[in-house]
Amino acid sequence: MKNGVIAVRVKEVLLKKNQGCAVFIGNDEKTFIIYVDPNMGAFITMYLQGIPKERPLTHDLIGHIFQALDVKLERVVINALKNSTYYARLILKVDNEIHRKVMEIDARPSDCIALALQAQAPMYVSREVWDAVEDMTELLESITASAQEEGDEDEEEEEGDEEEDEGGKAF
């Protein structure tokens, strides 16, 4: 299924007030959004940033099961978009004493993304989906720039607070 697919990565995960989480996926050419629930957005962020977890999450458990059974997550493919719903496939390579084969399993894109990040497996989107989605690169750049500006303002406020704490009132 590598023919007709485009390599992508998770570019950003942003919480959208009262609507869940926006996962920005794409490459240097284009970016699109998949909305997921806030918990899944948090899991994807944890895998993306390599944040350690006290106990295994569901996707960690799946990864441990894959490891125990000599199953490798070869790649994930976001392969369809129907009525604003994305569909995806896990491409697994089984190579153990019982089986030697490649399997495709239908899965939610959010689970595919989390598992790909956890297993450091490549992610792809079908050409059909790629051509159908709207490019959100400018939106992501705008949001990122706004967040950076807010962060800079927060740092300036904190510095002002420190000056006030250390030397009286800031003017």
Language model features with spans:
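Divalent-cation
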Residues: 1-171
